[in-house]
Amino acid sequence: MDTKDAAIVAELNNYAPFFGTASYYSSKLQGRPTASGERYDREKFTAACNILPLGTVIRVTNVRNGKSVRVRVNDRLSKKIGRIADLSGRAASTLGYVKAGLTRVKVEVMK
């Protein structure tokens, strides 16, 4: 691990779990490019988040039902929407909030 990678790991270790509202991507975005350059795939476990660096793996827990999923941050959110994460369709389905559209979540950086 080089110095830059070590600094990133040290920075990520400083993130305490945080809470907020999560939404999920519209199916209309399937195949469109994300901030990381990869194409959005609703079947992958990915997320958009403005708080954490691209490539960060996080555990997202639906606080209403206790279900959790691990996702990789590969995109950014519009700053106007007031959410902490926008999850892929598959991740939202696993967490059980597709019908509701939004849910309160706990986000933890995986070390």
Label the predicted regions.
Residues M1-K111:
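Secreted/periplasmic proteins
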